[in-house]
């Protein structure tokens, strides 16, 4: 009984990290000051070795919860939250992963097999250096609603499949967008039938919708997170996240056919009429009986907010969480209006920003397909960066 109590007390001290020497307000103030000076407190991944990582990841690679850096049991350790350089190193009254000693990646102290030790964290590596980059191939074949293209031109494109409920096999469900090694962003309305995660499959690196590719990567789904305030009448908050299942912290392997898209900065606002791209395996037009066999791309322009209202969309509800984009070309030279259509839902609307293709929207809804002067409607990604970040945490 005595040993059990000691073990419990040890765990409480290690995990909770009782702090007596600094008032909580001062500790938080120092932490905030250090975060602003030396790194982004909202970061969901680390760059290089992670020395400047100031995010809130707090789980080790083995799944253990990190110990508070201000724990009394760390006082004699080289690195702790009360050392003179603590703020500069990102240490303080928290249990977030850090790299104060220049190790290969962020780490923290944990309890493993009742022993006190340090362990590397499962924080993802930032793909900023390569996100949104591609080997673009100029499309050679035109199609109604867009252009046939190759997956290397849109390596962040995902294809989501669902098991049939009343028969064997599976069916193509929606498009998706790879935003990090283990996470795919998509549209909430794709999951109105409430598929359990084990009935979903994600394919990356595929040019043809149902024909396997040589470099494709296939994953089962660990989690399906639909926005808690998704409105299936108006499609407000039309966003969802899929966590890919893998036996290691790394899921998708980067290649010319598979690469994450860059997420935008929260304050990113591109000029009206900026040309952007969409991609997907959807129908060629509303009356098409089948989805496209090959990936297609479309070229559209961002509409001003004054043109993205119910007035221009047959009195359909348009909220501040939506943006509009459409093909503004017209005349005999451009009889084919580029637009998303059924089956493209959940796919990307991407625009060039700082020499990287960047995700601006998620294909959500529209009035018909390829109708002249009627834009498609997309989920505005900049409004959901906090939601994405919070749900990607372990």
Curated annotation (Swiss-Prot):
All copies of domain Kringle, residue ranges: 45-126
Catalytic activity, reaction form: Specific cleavage of Arg-|-Val bond in plasminogen to form plasmin
Enzyme Commission code(s) on record: 3.4.21.68
Function: Probably essential to support the feeding habits of this exclusively haematophagous animal. Probable potent thrombolytic agent.
Domain Peptidase S1 stretches: 143-393
A GO CC term attached to the entry: extracellular space
Family the entry assigns: Belongs to the peptidase S1 family.
Protein name: Salivary plasminogen activator gamma
Matches recorded under InterPro entries: Kringle, Kringle-like, Kringle_CS, Kringle_sf, Peptidase_S1_PA, Peptidase_S1_PA_chymotrypsin, Peptidase_S1A, Serine_Proteases_S1
Annotated compartments: Secreted
Signal peptide: 1-36
SUPFAM superfamilies: Kringle-like, Trypsin-like serine proteases
Cysteine disulfide partners in this protein: 45-126, 66-108, 97-121, 131-262, 174-190, 182-251, 276-351, 308-324, 341-369
